[in-house]
Amino acid sequence: MAVGKNKRLTKGGKKGAKKKVVDPFSKKDWYDVKAPAMFNIRNIGKTLVTRTQGTKIASDGLKGRVFEVSLADLQNDEVAFRKFKLITEDVQGKNCLTNFHGMDLTRDKMFSMVKKWQTMIEAHVDVKTTDGYLLRLFCVGFTKKRNNQIRKTSYAQHQQVRQIRKKMMEIMTGEFQTNDLKEVVNKLIPDSIGKDIEKACQSIYPLHDVYVRKVKMLKKPKFELGKLMELHGEGGGAGKPSGDEAGAKVERADGYEPPVQESV
């Protein structure tokens, strides 16, 4: 019999000794997710993060997290087919302050609108808001039968499709270019732009089911805490000295040394 080490036996202890199981949730904390003041329901849920440990700070793990929330949950509404994306930009205490990050229609709504015997018209445009956010907007609309129409199909001619697409782009650019992000979100909640496009295109070809189907965030300006606090309705003067609190610069000669005090 060959004499040698038994490699199967682990060093110092029984073979296959069990590791102590540590519950991963014992090292984590719950944080509240707060939606901006444009929405009726501000507290949209909770999120988990590992506690601050050494150089790994908990708030850094939360910043940049994106939450997709149905408009029904944000507005306390029963019927809503739009989903809003909210991104965590700052953490205050146990609250994650979020900002608008995008919008989308639900899949079932999008699929329910696509039918036979009609023309689907899509348009997209890049718009910069007054406060420096660059958004890409996607719009969709469908042709419908005229009131006295007998024919089964309602297809628009290529020239009409181009005219409608041009109108869509003009209206979206005009509506969003002159507003800041807060006003843009306020317009997206009821989707008033879809109704405006429907009215404007009535003379070219009657439309129905016109929606801004998607909003993508392409570029953001540099993060400012004051602006985020304004969005959350908590005032913009966070961390700034007000009026009398602002200090004045004291002029001192070069090589100045304070006098030695006799008693402290």
From Swiss-Prot:
Composition bias type Basic and acidic residues, residue spans: 242-255
One GO cellular component term noted in the UniProt record for this chain: cytosolic small ribosomal subunit
S-adenosyl-L-methionine in keyword set: no
Keyword Ribonucleoprotein in record: yes
MF-aspect GO terms: structural constituent of ribosome
Location of the region described as Disordered in the Swiss-Prot/TrEMBL record: 233-264
Keywords, comma-separated and alphabetical: Cytoplasm, Ribonucleoprotein, Ribosomal protein
A biological-process GO annotation: translation
Endpoints of the signal sequence: none
Highest taxon listed in the record's lineage: Eukaryota
Protein's cellular compartments: Cytoplasm
Pfam families: Ribosomal_S3Ae (PF01015)
HAMAP family given in the database record: Ribosomal_eS1_euk
The protein's assembly and partners: Component of the small ribosomal subunit. Mature ribosomes consist of a small (40S) and a large (60S) subunit. The 40S subunit contains about 33 different proteins and 1 molecule of RNA (18S). The 60S subunit contains about 49 different proteins and 3 molecules of RNA (25S, 5.8S and 5S).
Record protein name field: Small ribosomal subunit protein eS1
Organism: Eimeria tenella
Taxon lineage: Eukaryota, Sar, Alveolata, Apicomplexa, Conoidasida
